[in-house]
């Protein structure tokens, strides 16, 4: 259980230390570290991943006496988090079985997010104010012969995507195929104002049945 903030390096060292002793490391986050609207750099270090639930995190709510699972974590272009929540009351069920829940065979979850019709204005604004994140995205676009300022609303579909790859501390799985299948699915299917989101297993099964040539 981690109740208070700590450095990214210390979290990495502690996690690796436990794993080197043969332990499976599962962090439960105290109130100060609960996910809110945006994902912090430290919170990235507590993320886990499964094919059935995508990115997820465990939170411990001492006041309500529940263990909370936030799963199917995605981010929109404004950086806001979108996810589903499942709660497990204390004393109900076997704790080890609960912690294995994201990896167990189950009906694949899904949810939908309405697309932001003002996103082009937002991105132009971010570039005008030279926000580092969007300046980097613009630089990457230039290298591809693209310009973010010229994009129309449909060009930003899908607006909600999995957590970007980077310095995950608890995830050792190669996520390349997940990111690839995710993007390919929405390119292949008709653009929709209501974007439906699925776990990694869904996209894998989709392309297993519909091989992209």
Where do the protein language model's features map onto the residues?
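Non-catalytic C-terminal interaction segments of nucleic acid-processing enzymes
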Residues: 42-213
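Catalytic cores of nucleic-acid endonucleases
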Residues: 3-59
């Amino acid at each position: 259980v981690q109740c208070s903030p700590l450095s990214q390096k210390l979290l990495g060292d502690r996690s690796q230390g436990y794993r080197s002793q043969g332990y499976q490391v599962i962090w439960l986050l105290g109130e100060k570290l609960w996910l809110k609207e945006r994902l912090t750099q430290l919170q990235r270090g507590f993320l886990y991943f499964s094919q059935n639930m995508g990115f997820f995190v465990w939170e411990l709510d001492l006041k309500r006496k529940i263990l909370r699972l936030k799963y199917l974590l995605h981010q929109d272009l404004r950086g806001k988090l979108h996810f589903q929540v499942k709660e497990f009351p204390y004393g109900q069920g076997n704790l080890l079985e609960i912690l294995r829940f994201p990896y167990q065979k189950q009906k694949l979850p899904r949810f939908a997010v309405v697309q932001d019709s003002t996103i082009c204005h937002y991105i132009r604004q971010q570039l005008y104010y030279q926000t580092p994140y969007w300046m980097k995205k613009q630089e990457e676009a230039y290298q591809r012969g693209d310009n973010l300022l010229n994009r129309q609303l449909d060009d930003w579909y899908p607006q909600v995507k999995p957590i970007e790859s980077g310095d995950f501390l608890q995830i050792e799985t190669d996520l390349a195929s997940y990111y690839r299948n995710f993007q390919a699915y929405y390119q292949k299917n008709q653009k929709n104002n209501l974007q439906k989101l699925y776990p990694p297993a869904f996209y894998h099964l989709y392309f297993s049945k519909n091989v992209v040539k």
